[in-house]
Amino acid sequence: MRLGKMCGLLMKAFLAVLMLFVTAAAVEVYWEDEFDEAIANQCESIILKEEYLNMDFGEAIVVDFDTVLDLDGHELTACFKIKDGAKMTIKNGMLNISAYPIIEVCGSDDEERPTVLILENLKIEASRGIQINNDGYTRVEVNNTEMQALSYH
């Protein structure tokens, strides 16, 4: 019986270590389901490899972990909600959406770990732009980014 418990614990430890490597690696995505899976697995780096990806969004894609989304020169139609002290960098491509804020930044309760959005080398076309909620600590950095939106909040 002890041998069985020990094997079970070793298997759990092995799976935990394996999950660390899976979430740490950069993931290339070509399809919507791969993108959803990368977000669900809280990947630290997501690289869009499809020329145009249109996410089916009834709601915003919630990001509550640190990640870098590299559009790799491609276009993504999606909206994001960044919250709980997450740090998200979106770079190197185009974001496009209508009718919703393309990115909603929700504040963190922790002054030491604000919710952070970094935009680099992007073109953003959106009807409502970026919305920053004043419900906590936030930080937004914008570098070499063109935004065309009807409104900013």
Regions inferred by a protein language model and the residue ranges of each:
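Extracellular beta-strand-rich solenoid/capping regions of secreted or surface-exposed proteins
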Residues: 54-68, 75-118, 126-136
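Acidic/polar low-complexity surface segments
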Residues: 150-153
